[in-house]
Amino acid sequence: MAVKIRLKRMGAKKNPFYRIVVADSRSPRDGRFIETIGTYNPVAEPAEIKINEELALKWLQNGAKPSDTVRSLLSKQGILEKFHNLKYGK
């Protein structure tokens, strides 16, 4: 099973709010997911990002691939750098 970390759209029309979820790559965007690891609100000024660092690192170590948008959110929070240091032992 190929697992991805991606955004699940929530909120009202013209007022998006996203949950950062771990899901099977074959399931639809807003369909079934395995676990929620955070939230992202692009409407707030500045954009509001909340990610559970421990869960994100756990799933990255288990081989979950982040989508492009989630990858940029993780790097803004410094989580990808920590994952890189854990993986390559620096």
Curated annotation (Swiss-Prot):
The answer to whether keyword Ribonucleoprotein applies is yes
Q: Can you say what this protein is called? A: Small ribosomal subunit protein bS16
Q: Which family does it belong to?
A: Belongs to the bacterial ribosomal protein bS16 family.
In the UniProt record, which is one GO cellular component term?
cytoplasm
In the record, what terms sit under GO molecular function? structural constituent of ribosome
HAMAP family referenced in this protein's UniProt entry, alphabetically: Ribosomal_bS16
Keywords from the named record = Ribonucleoprotein, Ribosomal protein
The UniProt entry, under InterPro entries, shows: Ribosomal_bS16, Ribosomal_bS16_CS, Ribosomal_bS16_dom_sf
Q: Which PROSITE patterns match?
A: RIBOSOMAL_S16
Under NCBIfam families, the record lists: S16
Would the keyword Ribosomal protein be found if you checked this record's keyword annotation? yes
Q: Which GO terms describe its biological process?
A: translation
